[in-house]
A protein has these predicted regions:
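Secretory targeting signals
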Residues: 1-22, 47-122, 126, 164-183
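Transmembrane helix boundary and interhelical loop/hinge segments in multi-pass membrane proteins
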Residues: 19-36
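Short helix-to-coil transition segments within interhelical loops
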Residues: 36-42
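Helix-loop interface residues and adjacent transmembrane-helix termini in multi-pass membrane transporters
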Residues: 39, 127-128
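Residue-level recognition of pore/gate-forming positions within transmembrane alpha-helices
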Residues: 53, 139-143, 189
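Juxtamembrane non-transmembrane "cap" segments at the membrane-aqueous interface
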Residues: 74-87, 141-160
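Junction motif at the cytosolic side of a transmembrane helix
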Residues: 127, 184-207
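Central hydrophobic cores of alpha-helical transmembrane segments
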Residues: 131-145
Length: 207
């Protein structure tokens, strides 16, 4: 599990730099309006930005985790002499794929989680063209949903989701739990894109 709770919000705020900044530049330079007129459909622009945000944030997350592992590898063993199965989520995936691919698989979950939260930064720059606002809103939404979902069933708990924990109470199967987490995050990112598209379509078509 990814127990770096004190740093998750900071990581999300930093990762929001990857795509929200380019949207801010589009708006401040007038490029967004040019793009809208050129492609004829605002959804193409939104899809490209949501897809780019997901790809950049996820790959940066996985790359960052693996880079950190490479950095500390000379200082400590990659795997302890006596790994404890009971504190390692998806232990069978770890046994099957090995430590590096296991970390990449867990990083994928946090990366998709982070891309969902950073997508709120894409929203805010259209209404408040400010770089700081884009980073702050991702940070605040993460903490807000973390607090709200603490009272919801395990399957909807943001803490479990961003920690790459197994979320399904009905089964301990790593396959179904991993599939559920990734599918839920893909759906959340898609919903974020759809809402952004509808908001912008209404705003710019109505002048």
């Amino acid at each position: 599990m990814l127990y770096f709770d004190r740093f998750k919000a900071v990581m999300i705020a930093v990762l929001s730099l990857l795509c929200a900044g380019s949207v801010y530049e589009d708006i401040s330079s007038g490029f967004f309006l040019f793009q809208k007129l050129r492609v004829g459909r605002i959804e193409r622009y939104v899809i490209s930005k949501i897809a780019a945000n997901m790809f950049l944030v996820t790959t940066a997350t996985i790359g960052g985790i693996l880079l950190f592992v490479a950095f500390v590898r000379p200082l400590m063993p990659l795997v302890g002499n006596n790994p404890q199965q009971d504190i390692v989520e998806y232990y069978d995936i770890y046994q099957t794929l090995g430590p590096i691919l296991y970390l990449a698989a867990m990083g994928l979950i946090f990366g998709l989680s982070a891309s969902f939260f950073t997508s709120f930064g894409l929203w805010i720059v259209f209404y408040m063209p400010d770089r700081f606002a884009a980073h702050a809103i991702s940070f605040l939404v993460y903490y807000g949903l973390l607090s709200i979902t603490d009272f919801l069933p395990k399957e909807l708990d943001v803490w479990n989701l961003t920690s790459a924990a197994k979320m399904l109470r009905m089964t301990d199967s790593s396959f179904w739990n991993y599939l559920y987490s990734v599918s839920l995050l893909l759906v959340l990112n898609a919903i974020s894109g759809i809402v952004l598209w509808k908001k912008l379509k209404g705003r710019y078509e109505n002048g």
